[in-house]
Design a protein with these regions (language model features):
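Short alpha-helical transmembrane segments in multi-pass integral membrane proteins
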Residues: 1-17, 71-138, 184-241, 297-362, ...
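Transmembrane helical elements of multi-pass membrane transporters/channels
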Residues: 12-31, 132, 143, 166, ...
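Transmembrane alpha-helix boundary and packing residues in multipass membrane permease domains
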Residues: 17, 21, 32-33, 50, ...
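Residue-level hotspots within pore-lining transmembrane alpha-helices
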Residues: 19, 23, 27, 56-60, ...
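Helix-terminus/linker motif at the lipid-water interface of multi-pass membrane proteins
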Residues: 22, 26-44, 113-120, 176-187, ...
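Small-residue-rich hydrophobic transmembrane alpha-helices
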Residues: 43-107, 140-159, 258, 269-335, ...
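Short runs within selected transmembrane alpha-helices of multi-pass transporters and secretion channels
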Residues: 64, 133-152, 159-170, 192-207, ...
């Protein structure tokens, strides 16, 4: 693969994944804008529930990324039979997590909400939302595992089409049911949950139909789920367990923002919701870069050319730096127009503006270290580095410092947000060293007699 083919392969995946992430997050942004117009308490309740969804999504990402790391290397070798074994493993784990979470939320909804806020009104709104949204978990798991499998074979277009469909369906139903338009009942947060559930069911159904009808390499049969290959299971878990730690820590770190700010006041929760949704949308560019880099790096390792992998890693880092600077500037200039779409109190609006000013600077550093770590290092098969780095930063720096500043020192919400994101600055140095001077390339595939 020459440089032209490398850039073509990377940007073809990158652009589709970024657009998919933007459309997906647009669903959440539209939900928040509509719920923000409906009421600040409703917005805060759904925001708290979404932290549960975020933690759940992090677990699915771990199993999905483990699948992609393996499958992309087998994809480089054009061996498809081992890929099916890995995909079936990941799917079983994803479904198991969905069932467990559904059971826990069904039995302990209020206790789950208490982890994120102590405000009784917010808890009541959140429980109403949870009552319906819990039914999305199984459909979401199947969809995410199938999309990860397709991504490992450089197929990403279907993900974008599904996201656009979900955006249209979810926003349309939400508009009707949240506010009670066109003679429909006014359901508030329950209406928002119904819209999300409908979109998730349609996503899952259309994707399964696509895989059955169109996918020639990864079409799974029932027998694929019944087979047991203990060697593949050990290999898969060896990669996935550190990813679970990594994604779990990242989920906890993100949820801590809601936990810490949620115990300040409702204005801080609403401001964080508005700011974080815009930040996450711009962050889609970095997330897409990491996902595309992971597939390209894994595929190249599977082809067996280590010098080519090193050269591509250098080129990718330059792209990540450019992405960080342009993304930070973009976030700075769009913050006011986007915030004006929200019906926030003056206090919440002022806080949201402060948060976004801080996040504009954070973005510059995040857009380098996160894709370099999650795309190059992790995509190369070295997963424990990220787990160790995040464990150190989150457990020893971010959480203790943020809790101290919020609850002991009585710091302002803006200063607390700085503390919650301080790891994005710290991690740049070890990530740069690891990519350029450390060892991170690992061949994970096994020699097999099974023809692809």
């Amino acid at each position: 693969m020459n440089d032209r083919e490398f850039y073509k392969s990377f940007f073809r995946l990158y652009l589709v994944l970024v657009l998919q992430n933007i459309v997906t997050l647009s669903v959440n942004l539209a939900d928040n804008i509509m719920l923000g117009s409906y009421g600040e308490v409703s917005l805060s309740g759904v925001t708290s529930v979404n932290q549960i969804q975020f933690l759940y999504q992090q677990l699915l990402i771990a199993f999905g990324d483990g699948m992609v790391i393996f499958c992309s290397q087998y994809w480089g070798k054009k061996q498809f039979a081992p890929m099916k074994k890995i995909i079936a493993l990941a799917m079983r784990f994803g479904i198991a997590i969905a069932v467990i979470l559904f059971a826990v939320i069904s039995v302990f909804p209020e206790q789950a909400m208490l982890c994120f806020t102590s405000d009784r009104q917010i808890i009541e709104e959140g429980v109403r939302y949870l009552h319906t949204i819990r039914f999305t978990y199984l459909f979401f798991a199947v969809t995410q595992m199938l999309l990860a499998a397709l991504r490992s074979t450089e197929v990403a277009g279907i993900a974008l089409r599904l996201s656009v469909m979900a955006l249209v369906v979810n926003c349309g139903i939400n508009y009707v049911l949240i506010f009670g338009r066109f003679g429909a009942p006014e359901l508030g947060v329950t209406g928002a949950a119904i819209g999300t559930l409908t979109a998730r069911i349609l996503e899952c159904g259309v994707l399964i139909f696509y895989v059955i009808r169109k996918e020639q390499y990864l079409r799974l049969q029932l027998s694929d789920f019944l087979k047991r290959d203990w060697q593949f299971l050990r290999d898969y878990l060896k990669i996935t367990l550190p990813l679970l730690v990594l994604c779990g820590l990242w989920g906890i770190n993100t949820a801590m923002q809601t936990v810490v700010l949620g115990h300040m006041n409702s204005a801080a929760i609403a401001a964080n919701s508005a700011a974080s949704n815009l930040y996450l949308m711009v962050k889609s560019a970095a997330v897409g870069a990491a996902s595309a880099a992971s597939v390209v790096i894994g595929k190249t390792i599977g082809m067996g050319d280590e010098e080519l992998v090193k050269r591509y890693a250098r080129k990718l880092q330059i792209l990540f730096v450019i992405l960080g600077v342009t993304g930070g500037i973009f976030l700075y200039f769009i913050r006011i127009p986007i915030l004006n779409l929200y019906d926030l109190s003056p206090e919440a609006m002022a806080l949201a503006n402060q948060f976004l000013l801080i996040l504009s600077v954070v973005y510059v550093f995040m857009a380098y270290q996160m894709p370099s770590n999650a795309g190059i290092i992790k995509g190369g098969g070295c997963v424990e580095f990220g787990a160790k780095l995040d464990s150190t930063c989150i457990c020893l720096i971010v959480i203790p410092l943020s809790c101290y500043m919020a609850f002991a020192a009585g710091a302002s919400p803006a200063l607390v947000v700085v503390c919650l994101n301080i790891d994005q600055f710290i991690k740049c140095i070890p990530v740069f060293w690891k990519v350029n001077y450390g060892k991170w390339m690992r061949k994970l595939t096994r020699e097999t007699k099974i023809a692809g």
